[in-house]
Amino acid sequence: IGDTVCIQRAGDVIPQVLYADKGKRNKNTKKFNFPDKCPSCGSKTIKEFNYSTKKKDAVTRCPDPKFNCKEILREKLKHFASKDALNIDGFGKKIIQNFWDLNMIKYPADIFNLNFKKISSLDGWGDLSASNLEKAIKKSQKISLDKLIFAIGIRHIGQENAKTLAKYFVNIKKFKELFYGKKRKKILNYLLELDGIGETQVKSLETFFSNSSNLNTVSNLIKELNITDFKTSKSGIFYGKTIMFTGGLNKMSRAEAKSLVE
């Protein structure tokens, strides 16, 4: 801690550390030791094995073996409500943190059972702001299958992976077959044949859906949502073409433009 380092702009974007200048190292610098236990839940920290590189990742993380680490649960709520997931307007990180601290939410399904009368009486809130949040949450309850798969926060399942999986399952009934051990094993073998789904994603799906706590969380969530089937457009001027967005867009975000093209 306290070293002077040389960095370069890698990939034209990311600052990459090339080396530490030991000639400029002060006597009072300290070696940084990565925590061997999660400061939140106490689980032993790990470096995950990457099935693509066949090496351990550089990142040290909490494995959350029981899927009950409070820090991870809270951050998953933020991910769930984010723009690329359920996109709940006006339900940002600060509000989620506030409701978490007040023990009003812990799991995604809790969002759809909030007491808005109580919320209207909180500091900084009122009838109008509570009503607007209620409307935004109700609006978010209609969601496509791919958005749901991404929103529940399965490790290594990003937006494109979620779309690939949704294209395979098509509807929530088929997707729920992952909940059952015998069917899950057979399905996971099929998924390995899909473009963009590799051993890393399949292992992550197996770990996630083998946990009873996760199954309860997702099952309770599904009851609160109107999940539409995944539909692939096979018509239009963009069908079969690869579209790339670069630079800034004036009237919409890249995600919104991408959604329109799809």
For every predicted segment, state its role.
Residues D3-P15:
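Short, charged beta-turn/beta-strand-edge "cap" motif at the junction between a beta-strand
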Residues V5-C6, K66-D123, L128:
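Long, charge-rich boundary regions
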Residues F34-K37, L73, I95, Y107, ...:
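General structural feature for long, well-ordered alpha-helical segments within catalytic domains
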Residues C38, F112-L114, L145-I149:
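Interdomain boundary/hinge elements
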Residues L122-E262:
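DNA strand-break repair and replication-stress modules
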